[in-house]
Amino acid sequence: RPYACELIVAAGPCMFFISAFYYSKGANKCYPFTYSGCRGNANRFKTIEECRRTCVV
């Protein structure tokens, strides 16, 4: 799995509200979350399909 899949979700400190998806290693599932628009980390995907394709085993 890519490094992004090992990271915990991080929404970031900014004030935008962007729908995104993150991977939960413990559950081996992708979930929706609201990204703030800055910082965060690589565990952020535009679609649930992209998240699943990248991380779910």
Curated annotation (Swiss-Prot):
Pfam families in the cross-refs: Kunitz_BPTI
GO cellular component annotations of the record: extracellular space
Other observations noted: Negative results: mambaquaretin-7 is a weak trypsin inhibitor.
Subcellular localization(s) per the UniProt record: Secreted
Disulfide bond entries: 5-55, 14-38, 30-51
Domain called BPTI/Kunitz inhibitor: residue spans: 5-55
Family from the record: Belongs to the venom Kunitz-type family.
A molecular function (GO) term: serine-type endopeptidase inhibitor activity
UniProt superkingdom: Eukaryota
Tissue: Expressed by the venom gland.
Physiological role: The mixture of mambaquaretin-7 and mambaquaretin-8 interacts with vasopressin V2 receptor (V2R/AVPR2), probably in a selective manner. This mixture inhibits vasopressin binding human V2R in the nanomolar range (Ki=3.14 nM), and also potently inhibits vasopressin-induced cAMP production (IC(50)=58 nM). In vivo, intraperitoneal injection of this protein into rats increases diuresis, without any loss of electrolytes.
Record keywords, A-Z: Disulfide bond, G-protein coupled receptor impairing toxin, Secreted, Toxin
Major location (coarse): secreted
Domain comment, as recorded: Exploits its two major loops and engages more positions in its interaction with V2R. The pharmacophore defined by numerous amino acids positioned in loop 1 (9 to 18) and loop 2 (34, 39 and 44) may be at the origin of the absolute selectivity of this protein for V2R.
Species for this entry: Dendroaspis polylepis polylepis (Black mamba)
Record's protein name: Mambaquaretin-7
